[in-house]
Amino acid sequence: MAMDKKGDLEWMPPRPEPVHWRNRQRSLAYSVTLTLVALFFTFALRPEAFPSFLVRKGLHKSPLEQVLTRVPLTDGHNDFAIWTRAFYQNHIYRANFTDHDELYGQVDFPRLRKGRLGAQFWSVYVECARNPNEPGVQYEIVRDTFQQIDLVHRMINHFPDFLVPASSVADVHHNFYHSPGRISSLLGIEGLHQIGGSASVLRMYHELGVRYASLTHTCHNEYADSEAPEEPRHGGLSTAGEAIVAEMNRMGMIVDLSHTSLATQRAVFNVTRAPVMYSHSSAYALCPHSRNVPDDLLQMLKENDGIVMISLYPEYTNCQDADAASLADVADHIQYVGNLIGYRHVGLGSDFDGMSHGPKGLEDVSKYPDLIQELLDRGVSVDDLVGVTGGNVLRVLGDVEHVARSLADTLPLEDDVKPFFE
């Protein structure tokens, strides 16, 4: 049955009494004020209640805190392990080696925490042999390397409030979010003289957490030439070296070019299927030392999508006067490489405890935030510094893992062994 307009209106709810617009404005302002006060006390008393998307973006934090909380601060090279061998004979259960005292050197647990470190590639370095052809020398180097790997594992187990194991990008990110304040601990060897001429040994190192291998240290080996001796042995990478690079690609181990000759570096860029790293090197253009990377090789690194992790070693930082090397000089190297090939390819590789002293302002591991603040003050963006302080090297590690997965059907490199029966 149809209804007239009057009938339709009778079904509508009564119209409310008019509210003066000034009263409505006061009411709205009062409500907003109460809401803001409630939010302030909620977030002040319970910071975890802050909206997750703002926490992820770090919009409520200073630029320095945004950098340090978006990614684990990751150092590509630290010699704490060999320092512990040299000065404590690898004894970490004695009263003079604790997690609450300052240890001799540039690294200890209180200073690591103050420096806000989130992940570390601990070098399990063993020096080159003075007489490499003497019987038993290669065995001793491999044994000593296993002792250094074991040392880091024992440190992780004995100091769990500070260290946590990691062997992948996923581990590092998981630890960063679920074990805050603990340092994800990965390993790196510093020269293929440490593998005793055996791909099998290199694979065992990988099983124990070694995620990068420098092709050389300060000596040539059967795989590659170092930058240190004047006379090259192979003219770069040997045939065996090409095979070992392919094996590292297959197993998911980063190829590290620090300490290698320029010819070795160029050869590696031509054969590797994965991004590479310089774990602790700087810009040759600013300090023309053979340990640093020239511009043309930085361009090759960009094409490879790899990373150079800027060293703090004074002799590689300020070639005019190493004793005058400073935090500002290190920042210059970071900016130079970032401006030349992009900050995507820059990281931090301190070499703490591998040098007699650090640059002024970067004397020990507690000083990382000062370097980050200097770069912020110079106008480097938060996003770029998130990459420099950890995002870039973790991206490289992730890419290396991806290449390894793509090579899963490739057979491992086998050692040639002597016939058992002759």
From Swiss-Prot:
Residues given in the record as Zn(2+) binding sites: H77, D79, E190
Keyword Plastid: no
Glycosylation site residues: N96, N270
EC number: 3.4.13.19
Annotated membrane topology: Single-pass membrane protein
Coiled coil: none
Described purpose of this protein according to its UniProt entry: Dipeptidase; part of the gene cluster that mediates the biosynthesis of aspirochlorine (or antibiotic A30641), an unusual halogenated spiro compound with distinctive antifungal properties due to selective inhibition of protein biosynthesis, and which is also active against bacteria, viruses, and murine tumor cells. The non-ribosomal peptide synthetase (NRPS) aclP is responsible the formation of the diketopiperazine (DKP) core from the condensation of 2 phenylalanine residues.
PANTHER family: DIPEPTIDASE (PTHR10443:SF12), MICROSOMAL DIPEPTIDASE (PTHR10443)
Protein name as catalogued: Dipeptidase aclJ
Organism from which the protein derives: Aspergillus oryzae (strain ATCC 42149 / RIB 40)
The encoding gene: aclJ
